[in-house]
Amino acid sequence: MVYVRYLLLVVVFGFAPAVEAQDESIDLEALYQQIDDAISQSPQYVAELEGRVTGSRDRLLREESLEKRIQIAEELFQLYSSYRNDSALHYAELCISLADSLRRPDLVGRFRSLLAYQCSNSDMDNESLEQLRLVKRSALDSLGLVDYYHAWMHVYGELGSYTQREHLRLDYFAQQDAYRDSVLMVADEGSEEWLHLKVDVLCARQLYQDALELSKEWLKKVTDGTHESAYAAFYCSMVYDRLKNHDMTCYWLGRSALDDIKCAVMNQASLLFLAEHLANDGEIDRALRYVEFAKACNLAFSPQMRAYQVNSVVNVIEKSSQVSRDQTRIILVFASVVIFLLLMALIYTIVFYRRRR
């Protein structure tokens, strides 16, 4: 996934203090405890989202106006986009059908682009390409162009990540870069699309301090506890990871994971990355709990989704666990040798004194 290429304090998370957290002491254990608590309350967060979904579905059934039906259908698509992939695909297709009934090629193209992105975000790259090739670019407005270029950028990134052929990988990533530049040209400066791509560009150029400053500005624009704040926090963690700041990387990964859980996001990524860091730090039990929760979420979002990523983290955990066992075994052997030598010394001393007597 795109994520593969490349996130709390005990007090309330105000944004100004949170953004400056790198200058303060942070309590990662308190953050992890908040994540543990949020995981235990996950059914409540899911029920809250289901309540919003039910309300929107009921309004859609009652609504007769095509214009309003398409608005509600898009609302349902957005609610499902990180919750249940099959339902998100269904409502994206409904949006396309309604837009076609309204004879709105601009909306048809935009919703096809959103459908294409949803497909490539759930390992359906061929279906994504199929939808994008049906879009009439000349009919798109500026918003539609952002979604269109963004979908192309994403699917080429996915293709580049998966292929084992080097020349194809280079070609796919070159196409991804070209569409990224197109998004930056048409997206509003300061929008979410513009911000995350700009952070990517700055990191690629190794301008990490500039990327960090932009990430701070982004965090000031989002509301704590939302999917948008989770997304911004993930990118902040990515910058700190490039800066080799382990604690701040884990901090922002934790912030991102916490918001994802509270928003009933099933398309989990941040928690998996955090679990990998924890495994490398030797916190095997907690890492396993996080992986199991993330795995269950991803299976609920889409079967087989990120299975390879879960397995990758599990492998890290197993290796860390093996290293821990090996270290324990070495310590036990060393301790046994020391005890044996001490016993031998004690026996020698006793025998020596008895002979002198």
Regions found by a protein language model. Name each.
Residues 321-357:
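Alpha-helical transmembrane signal-anchor helices
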Residues 2-6, 13-326:
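A "functional boundary" signal
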Residues 5-8, 333-334:
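Alpha-helical transmembrane segments of integral membrane proteins
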